[in-house]
Amino acid sequence: CTINYIHDDFLLHNFEEKYDYIIGNPPFFKMKSTNKLLNVYRCNAINKATTNICSFFLDKAINLGNYVALVFPKFLLNTPEFAPTRSYLSEKAIECIIDFGENGFPGVLVETLAVFINNLSRPSNTRVASITHGKYLSQSQKYIFDEKLPYWIIYRDSRFDEVCKKLDFNVFKVFRDRQITNSQLSDSGDIRVLKSRNISDDGKKIINLSDYDSYINYEAL
């Protein structure tokens, strides 16, 4: 058995062959628009709607590997910028999703999961495991990746379906609050960010507070 180490930028390296397995933990961060590598990485990306570098790693791994297993931010399941990714992955066999919650990396409050993708098989059942809750399920991939829903609902069940029947969808656009950090906020900007103290106890009024009100610019989203 021979081990060949390749010390290079994975996203730029020209691989001459495909691999049986690609296993990894790519970096998670949004690249700045001023970064010259952003457009270079995007050239070969499947999902060109995002600037998050982890997406470029996933796209390249999918093109290179027969079987791909990656640790990934949990926002893969539900953020709009990853809708193109969910679309193409839905056509592949997602054999397992392990939900680590915030327990993936000690001291880091980022929810993560591991996704196992079989490029040589057709979609069937997906094993879903919640490390946080000790929950283990076998779900129909078609059921939890239902095209009628905007997100992947990996814990979907009959109770969820009953609630869905009573709701009107596509009324609001959602942005997960954990994607917004204090470093992105300022006292002026394009979009007002409402925090807990900005909302009255009865939920009917917006309260303006000096030295507390925050804004975020479009480019940070």
Regions found by a protein language model. Name each.
Residues 36-45:
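Short glycine/proline- and charge-enriched loop/turn segments
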Residues 47-102, 109, 114-117:
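Conserved Class I SAM-dependent methyltransferase catalytic core
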